[in-house]
Amino acid sequence: MERGVSYYLWIPFKFIHQTFGSLLLKLLGLRSPSDHSFPEDGEEEVKVVEVSSRGLPGKKNVLKKSRESSGKPGGTNKKPF
């Protein structure tokens, strides 16, 4: 190994601990203390909400710009003589 070069090995200890704990739980039927921190499949509460675009009110009061506008600010829309 060259001088100044070092190699690091990252070991996911928490993942390994949870994996072995779940294997022991399945094999031996024992409850481990780590079970209290994570909910099981049956304990997780899920709320399902159905959303539909048809339930939304449509835009009925849409302001339309008059075609007779001159485009200048401050004026009223009057027909030219």
UniProtKB/Swiss-Prot annotation:
Residues 57-81 are annotated as: Disordered. Keywords: Plant defense. The keyword Nucleus does not apply. The record marks 71 as: Required for ligand-receptor interaction. GO terms for biological process: innate immune response; response to jasmonic acid. Pfam families: Pep1_7. The keyword Signal does not apply. Residues 1-54 form a propeptide. Elicitor of plant defense. Belongs to the brassicaceae elicitor peptide family. This is Elicitor peptide 4. The gene is PEP4.
